[in-house]
Each structure stands twice: as structure tokens, then as C-alpha cells.
């Protein structure tokens, strides 16, 4: 049948012929099911749906007394696709993705903080009130800034993306500073009552660096000795060669008696 392969569509007919010819003793159990629900016979593949990014904004429209909620659809550029990529599923994008990328590009060290990745439904952020940044039962992290910025964009009239980002970032810095102060005060109070703490992370890192440097210095010394031995095997001992040169130079300077 040309380039089309109908083997999968005719699996029931093949099973019936094999049973009639005696190749199989009993018909398969799925024979009646395939007869009731036959395979699809559509030979034309449809292209995947294009997902559009929808944004919610609160804007003051001309002639309106109060701000109204407006839904904006981001226009996507139509790019010609290769034949091999024509039927691939399209990428699903959310507005939070762009906000998250911008925040972690400006604050890469926030990714080094420990985070809780366990979620019940994947929509845990919807159970918080993001009219404020700090939430009870949730640690302050970069995702809090993203959700706070998104809440400002969806609820504050005529606010820009950069303005919402500045507001959320300023609140984030203030809470981070408050956490650092509380941590320092708690450590000072504990030390005042007799508590002792081990070395800090910086001290541990410096100790590991010193150990690595000492290990490298011993390795470099051994390598230098091996290199000197290889050189001496071809040119002789450097002390003997230096002594011979000194003797020759002295003989040239001192006149030989007649």
C-alpha cells in the first residue's frame, strides 16, 4: 500500500486468519474488544494546538469611572518549522516563568538556599494570600517574590512589570535583613548563656582550602624531584657538572708555570 503500513489496523483480521489456519489454538481475549472499539483509521495527522499566553491586568479604560480587569493575549511570532518538528507538542508557557527567570538571574545565590520541593497538588501557591509577601507556614524564598509580583500585576491598577518587581524586591530585602538580625541576636543570646558553637561555614571552607593547598604543595615537591632526577639521568649530577665548570674556569685564569 505504498508508504502506508496498515498492519496495526488489521490486527483483528490477522488474528482471525491465524486461528482459522490453526497457528493459534484459541482466539485472543481482546478479539471482541477490538471488534467493538476498532483502531482509528485517520491517516492525516493534525498539528498541535498553539498555546497562547494570557495575562490578567487591571487598567483604567477611557470613559470608565473604575479600573476594570482586562485579559491580554500575547501575540506569538509564527516561525516556519522543520518537517521533523511540525507535529511536536508546543511548549506551554506561564507568566510566572518570565518573572521567575528575571528574579533568579538577578539573585543567583537564592538557588543555593534549601527549599521544600514536596507539593500536594502543584498549586500550593494558590492557598496563600499574596497581598503581603510573608506567609505563615511558608519560608521566604524566590517563589514568594514571583507570586507577590504576579499578584501586584493582577490587582493593582495601571502598574508596570518593573514597578511591581521593585515593590516585591524591596519587601523581600527588608524581610531578609530582618531574618539576619534575628539570627545574629539569637546567636549572641545563646553565647551569653554559655552556648558554644562550632566553626562557621567560612572557617570550614578555609580549613579545607588549606588542606588542599598542603596536599598540592607535597605533590608539586615530589614532581619537582622526579623532574630533576630525569634531567640528571641525561646530563649527569648538577653538582658535579657545576664543580667541573668551576675547575675549568679556574684553570683558565691561573697561568700554567713554565
Swiss-Prot record:
InterPro entries: Ribosomal_mS23_fun
Keywords linked to the UniProt accession: Mitochondrion, Ribonucleoprotein, Ribosomal protein
Signal sequence segment: none
Compartment(s) of residence: Mitochondrion
GO molecular function, one term: structural constituent of ribosome
Keyword NADP: no
Cellular component terms per the entry's GO annotation: mitochondrial small ribosomal subunit
Sequence similarity: Belongs to the mitochondrion-specific ribosomal protein mS23 family.
Record's subunit section: Component of the mitochondrial small ribosomal subunit.
Protein name per its UniProtKB record: Small ribosomal subunit protein mS23
Species annotation: Neosartorya fischeri (strain ATCC 1020 / DSM 3700 / CBS 544.65 / FGSC A1164 / JCM 1740 / NRRL 181 / WB 181) (Aspergillus fischerianus)
Gene: rsm25
